[in-house]
From Swiss-Prot:
InterPro entries: DNA_mismatch_repair_CS, DNA_mismatch_repair_MutL, DNA_mismatch_S5_2-like, HATPase_C_sf, MutL/Mlh/PMS, MutL/Mlh/Pms-like, MutL_C, MutL_C_dimsub. SMART domains: DNA_mis_repair, MutL_C. This protein is involved in the repair of mismatches in DNA. It is required for dam-dependent methyl-directed DNA mismatch repair. May act as a 'molecular matchmaker', a protein that promotes the formation of a stable complex between two or more DNA-binding proteins in an ATP-dependent manner without itself being part of a final effector complex. It holds the Pfam family HATPase_c_3. This is DNA mismatch repair protein MutL. Residues 414-433 are annotated as: Disordered. GO terms for biological process: mismatch repair. Keywords: DNA damage, DNA repair. GO terms for molecular function: ATP binding; ATP hydrolysis activity; ATP-dependent DNA damage sensor activity; mismatched DNA binding.
Length: 660
């Protein structure tokens, strides 16, 4: 008796489903890709309970004939390739003939389909891969596939499902990527009767980006284009000031297929060069058109891994396209042009820490307990509405009516403020070892900060500043040199650490609420983790499509910091994922103290410098910034006398030291 047997087809399909169908989002991906291959122009995805209860994909594509319908549930049955040579010139998204049989083997599936050549359509119902019903019905041209009770016969897979919100976020991300890959298709995503995503299907990639990431993001995107004999690269990349905390917003498309490729991601970052802050990543949508002979998509059942010939040449093409596009943007003239148009409330201009700046006075406000730049000229003022979009080139400005023709303004411009994400306010040179994603280093930092003891600070007499960076003071122990950024960072850290801890009861109503816009997946993830934000006094309410509204803010957060501060908190929450309230508050205090502190190349007047030293003296630990860098160094009188050789060692001591 032989020990080797051929597995039943249903069991083989269930095994294949383990590779193809990892979660409900995998089902959505496979069904939508089939609809795209069927040349659909409209695709509607409806889900219930994040796809575990029901997934329905409706398209207006070519449909299937009555004879082909049962064959679609047979493993390795496909209409997309017919010979071995076809495998090397694949232009469809699917070709393996595994998706539909795999999905059908672990669910109940209902398919209604019709082609335009016939007067009637077909209905197929199957459970666990076994066909129960196959009959003729009346149905529109196209295909409607309903998947119910997913994983009903594979409970082990259900056990590893995450929360409903997490699974829904994965589905939203899949639909968004496919929408970007195929802007010519109108996509609609509906979850439990609520519309989450809708694109117009006009074929305009910028319009698709606006529908997914929002109009504000689209205004900060630059077009790129490059080509050689083998590749055509096009798409949009964000300005260096518009970044995110992870790579999830970097979308690479090859012949209309979303792929993951580490080397191409690196090429994108190389194109930005030093313009990106460490640990930050741009928003990118790059479409690569390539000869199918140069790309092998038959690597993994999910077809997200692609081997590309001449990959180094493609990397250089992408990097060059991005760097050339950024080089063409003369950001300073554009910013000044927008500043001249200011007609609203003004904020202090954010400085650039790595460039030699013109000296400007920084003053101290004892009532607000904070520093400010004196607004003496129009060029030092930025309008609130242009703070985030001030550097956009005229060629990439997009009108709302142009991008979103079906959208309507719900509220007047004076009833709310549209919050803008903060620009990068500290650089790698400030804290080269700071990485909020490195949980081990961060934990060590937090433990050190928690165990700090009260220190005694010497009495200092301030007398000068050097290079707009270092303060000089004298005391009974000699000369002290203070790093002004590290000093105020320590002051701010202890302020935020204490104030954030009191956030539960100290809230102030906003006269004009703020609106905060996120991508679909981030919007869903934030809803799931909203309790963490509530713990620190941030109460966001759902307000329209992928938008939250903030009606009150914690007292510890200054009014001018609301927009950037809330975005920073949300980014950290998305980045750190699950985190205790205590750790979250400490991380938040560290981050906000760094971003809110004065930087190098910024001159202080005497009064402001003395007040900074006074605040530093009141800190629990005035000697180190939260990241461990020294705040000040000391040269004693004896040290100074040795440097000027007023004190010299005798010959005996020098011989003892081995110098003679």
């Amino acid at each position: 008796m032989t020990n080797i047997i051929e597995l039943p087809e249903v069991l083989a399909n269930q095994i294949a489903a383990g590779e193809v169908v990892e979660r409900p989002a995998s089902v959505v991906k496979e069904l939508v890709e089939n609809a795209i291959d069927a040349k659909s122009s409209q695709i509607t995805v409806e889900i219930e309970e994040s796809g575990l209860k029901m997934i329905q994909v409706t398209d207006n594509g070519e449909g299937m004939s009555h004879e082909d319908l049962p064959l679609s549930l047979r493993r390795h049955a496909t209409s997309k390739i017919k010979s071995q040579s076809d495998l090397f010139r694949i232009r469809t998204l699917g070709f393996r003939g595994e998706a539909l049989p795999s999905v059908a083997s672990i669910s109940k599936i209902t398919i209604k389909t019709a082609t335009k050549e016939v007067t009637h359509g077909s209905l197929l119902i199957a459970t666990g891969g076994e066909i129960e019903t196959l009959e003729a019905i009346s149905t529109p041209t196209g295909t409607k596939i309903k998947v119910e009770n997913l994983f009903y016969n594979t409970p082990a897979r259900l056990k590893y499902m995450k929360s409903l919100q997490a699974e829904l976020a994965h589905i939203v991300d899949v639909v968004n990527r496919l929408s970007l890959a195929h802007p010519e298709v109108a996509f609609t995503l509906i979850s439990d009767g609520r519309q989450l995503t809708q694109t117009s299907g006009t074929g305009d990639l910028r319009q698709a980006i606006a529908g997914i990431y929002g109009l504000n993001t689209t205004k900060k995107m630059l077009a790129i284009s490059n080509a050689d004999l083998d590749f055509e690269v096009s798409g949009y990349v964000s300005l260096p000031e518009l970044t995110r905390a992870n790579r999830n917003y970097m979308t690479i498309l090859v012949n209309g297929r979303y792929i993951k490729n580490f080397l191409l991601n690196r090429a994108i970052l190389d194109g930005y060069g030093s313009k990106l802050m460490v640990g930050r990543f741009p928003i990118v949508v790059i479409d690569i058109q390539i000869d199918p002979y140069l790309a092998d998509v038959n690597v993994h059942p999910t077809k997200q891994e692609v081997r590309i010939s001449k990959e180094r040449e493609l990397m250089a093409l992408i990097s060059t396209a991005i760097s050339e596009s950024l080089k063409e943007q003369d950001l300073i003239p554009d910013a000044l042009e927008n500043l001249a148009k200011s007609s609203t409330r003004h904020f202090s201009k954010p400085e650039q820490t790595q460039l030699p700046l013109q000296s400007r006075g920084l003053y101290y406000d004892p009532q607000k307990n904070d520093f400010f730049v004196k607004e003496s000229a129009v060029s030092e003022k930025i309008p609130e509405t242009d703070f985030y979009f001030g550097a956009v080139d005229n060629s990439v400005k997009v009108e709302k009516a142009e991008l979103l023709p079906h959208s309507e303004e719900v509220i007047g411009p004076s009833s709310v403020k549209h919050a803008s994400r903060p620009q990068n306010t500290f650089t790698e040179t400030d804290h080269p070892n700071l990485d909020l994603k490195n949980r081990q280093k961060l934990s060590q930092m937090l433990n050190r900060l928690e165990n700090e003891e009260k220190s005694v600070f010497p009495e200092l007499d301030y007398f000068g500043q050097m290079h707009g960076t270092y303060l000089f003071a004298q005391g009974k122990d000699g000369l002290f040199i203070i790093d002004q950024h590290a000093a105020q960072e320590r002051v701010k850290y202890e302020y935020y650490r204490d104030k954030i801890g009191e956030a539960d009861s100290s809230l102030q109503q906003l006269l004009v609420p703020y609106l905060f816009e996120f991508s679909g997946s981030d919007f869903i993830n934030l809803q799931e983790k909203m309790a963490l934000l509530n713990e620190v006094g941030i109460f966001l309410e759902v307000y329209g499509h992928n938008t939250f509204i903030l009606r009150e803010h914690p007292i510890w957060m200054k009014e001018e910091e609301i927009a950037s501060g809330v975005y920073e908190m949300c980014d950290m929450l998305l980045l750190t994922n699950e985190v205790s309230i205590k750790t979250y508050r400490a991380e938040l205090a560290i981050m906000m103290s760094c971003k809110r502190s004065i930087k190098a190349n910024h001159s202080l007047d005497d009064y402001s410098a003395r007040n900074l030293l006074l605040q530093l003296a009141q800190c629990q630990n005035p000697y180190n910034c939260p990241h461990g860098r020294p705040v000040l160094i000391n040269f004693s009188k004896a040290d100074m006398e040795k440097m000027f050789r007023r004190i010299q060692e005798n010959h005996t001591s020098l011989r003892e030291l081995g110098k003679y």
